Amino acid sequence: MDDTYNKLPDEIWLEIINFSNEKNLLFTNKSFFELFDFMKVEEDIIECIIKYNLLHILAYIISLGGPESFIIKKNIITTESLNRHFKMSCEKGQYTIVTYLVALGADFRIDNDYGLIHAAKNGHIGVVKYLVSKGVNIGANDNCAIKFASENGHLEVVEYLVSKGADINANNNYPIEMASKNGHLKVVEYLVSLGVDIRANDDYVVGLAYYYDHHEVVDYLVSQGAVLNKSKYSSSYNAFILLPVEIWIKIVNHTQEIGLLLTNRSFFELLSLINIKVDIIEYISNNNLTDVLKYLVFLKSINHPFCRFIRYSSLDDYLVKSCCEGDLSIIKDLILLGASERKAVMLACQNGHLEIIRYFVSQGFNIKCGSNCAVTIASENGHIEVVRYLISLGADINSGNNYAIKYASENGHLEVVKYLVDQGANIRANNDRAVRFASRKGHLEVVKYLVSKGANIRAKDDRAVTLASQNGHLEVVKYLVSQGTDIKAGDDYAVRWASRNGHLEVVKYLISQGANIKADDDYAVRWASLNGHLEVVKFLVNQNADIRAINNYAVRWAHKNKHFDVVEYLISQGAVINPT
């Protein structure tokens, strides 16, 4: 940029850029970078930086303080943008960009370690190593990382993941099965060297290799002891080329191995001539035949009679799987085939897949449908970026008697709880259910926050402390007591149910605070005995509980439930098992 432009005052630069809408002009000189603080930025800054390969700008933002810099704190660069581009960069193996985005605050564990799984899937060893060094879970999503790396033949990634503890037998030998299916001999050899059982599932590994014409893999597996049953696995090449149509129809009708036809579109029409007993959508899903799925979409678009074989219940099952994995391409195809669009959005909210939600919103989906279920589900599962996005579109967080904050509190999602409160959620709704259910689940920080915002811990006869006691959450109990809760409420419900459920430390604490263990005819010792909690029983006896209350109820029910150690102890203390 020449001196003429450099000498322009800031206000002229702002006018030029706001008029031209060319925000990337600011990236051309670090001295102009601060102008972002004075502008209304609508573009995705990270997208612009990556598009023009301005990695030095990312480095500069990091030097400004990374997550603490004004450009992050003022939401000029959003968390959603950082996370979205982090995932895409992991998929593409853009190592430097990945490290910079993490330094700026991207969540490297977002969506159940999406970054690691897709870096491994695409063979990006540098990104994989970096993410592992940051502490991702290599076993996330049922060891998807090693499964996908094996499936796609990325030996170096497979070796590295194994060195870090990945399960080579994940999902019933999925890694070697998919490596064999796709002809990745080196990966197969490596997995065999580690002791994978190549004969598992009735020699399925060698059968797959044979079926897909990977003869080198077949020869190797046979040399290692695998047994190939050629009558069970027909070679796709020879069978399709040599057999006449009428024989193929007979074979498939007899074996119900519809995969023999699904591997080649030129034979797909034969399916309409076959008496299919196998669920075709389930088969496509289980075997990851996405190209066949797309062909089904085409057949449906022309009203092909074969579409009568599609079972809608199976479409929804496949939809659940795809939404969990965040695979938008498959989801689109399933919707076109008749799967529920609403279910797809709710599953995306449940699993935190913001891109999927954005897509359906762009297609006109009403995020307020079903009493604002979308924002409730996202809140329940702690997906803060999804919650923010839905609220920005007008989702009603108070719908359904404030279910959003109740479920977020119950599941311990403090960040979501705070955001919902900032947006006007009513923490007192439904008799202070939020604090009651946070107490029940033991989420101390959520309880403290709700109390700081005015939640009533004594609602519903001090239900918060009784639920915390019932479930053994000692620290929550202590905190609630410090805030003035009545541990004797409900005829000493707290100590009775803590005893009933075997929470010894809670029982001890409650008694130290004045709880009455003899309440309700010595309920505490009776039910501790009935449920076999010996240490609780001993402690209560030492505190003078009456073990003979209600006609020796304690020992009789301990005996009935076969808690013989409790029976022996109670008898030693004077209980009578068969009172006259």
From Swiss-Prot:
Repeat in keyword set: yes
InterPro entries listed in its UniProt record: Ankyrin_rpt, Ankyrin_rpt-contain_sf
One Pfam match: Ank
SMART domains: ANK
ANK repeat locations: 81-110, 111-140, 141-170, 172-200, 202-230, 314-339, 340-369, 370-399, 400-429, 431-459, 461-489, 490-519, 521-549, 551-579
Domain of life of the native organism: Viruses
Keywords: ANK repeat, Repeat
UniProt keyword annotation of Repeat present: yes
Name of this chain's protein: Putative ankyrin repeat protein L63
Organism of provenance: Acanthamoeba polyphaga mimivirus (APMV)
